[in-house]
Amino acid sequence: MALNNTYEARLVQQETAVGAGVQILLLALLGSAIGMGPAGWLTGLAFAMATWAVLSRALHRTRPRSFGPANRVTLGRAILVGGVTALVADSFESSPPVSLLVGLTAVALILDGVDGKVARHTGTSTALGARFDMEVDAFLILVLSVYVSTQQGPWVLLIGAMRYAFVAAARFAPWLNAPLPPSMARKTVAAMQGICLLLAGADLLPYLGNLAVVLLALGSLVWSFGRDVVWLWRNSRKATPAVAQVAPEQRGEARAAEVRLTVRADVRAGTRAEEREMLELAVR
């Protein structure tokens, strides 16, 4: 059994290594097609190595029996996101191939709805898979916001940075880590971000049109995060009084138990003393 588990773990880790290899192959194809510069190459390679390292560590900790079909789809999306990341980094050195950038991004966004359906259809939904999917989505939005910010201004970076700011804030405010109720509005807003940024990045609309699209994305995201933060805060405030009410009762029960133990000990000590006195009298 141990040998089988080791063999399965190796197969799972091999899939992440294959993903890194495919990522490097995609970078080579992009490099030969557009003559990608050092910035694009280094950024793409850094993304490939970071994805491989983080995913391998997560798989080592969770030890799944197989990588799973849904995770393979998500890994494919991550490879495409790595290509988009390399192209965006290269755009700071030379004019970007917009059609290629839009094409890779569009496929990555389309596949975003595929991995979840595959997981549900095959019964392979896992917490790791959901987190993997979420991180790929968040990083793609961050990269797209960097690209669009070169056209609309640095304020666009708020779209990509908002999720990471929320995660960072949760370290100082643990109540932000509480689970949220399912929300179709939240899912819709999340899906809108990639579509709006892709539309603005494709530069199909005039400047004011692209500006309106990006403002719509940012406004809806602020509303969604704001609504969730308010709900979490109110929920934490409701939970605090309940804890405060239960705590004194628990302390009272503990005190009563302590008193009962003390009384029992005193009774036992008194009984033993009486027994010793009776023995002494009998000896006399």
PLM region spans:
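A feature for the membrane-embedded catalytic helix bundles of lipid/isoprenoid biosynthetic enzymes
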Residues: 1-71, 134-260, 275-284
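Membrane-embedded alpha-helical segments that form the functional core of polytopic membrane enzymes
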Residues: 41-55, 72, 78-126, 208-222
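Active-site His/Glu-centered metal-binding helix of metallohydrolases
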Residues: 79, 110-118, 131, 135, ...
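Broad hydrophobic/π-residue packing in well-ordered secondary structure
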Residues: 84, 117, 128-131, 145, ...
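Hydrophobic alpha-helical segments and helix-packing faces
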Residues: 100-103, 107, 128, 132, ...
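Juxtamembrane helix-boundary/capping and inter-helix hinge elements in multi-pass membrane proteins
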Residues: 121-128, 150, 176-177
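Intrinsically disordered, low-complexity tandem-repeat regions
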Residues: 261-262, 266, 270-274
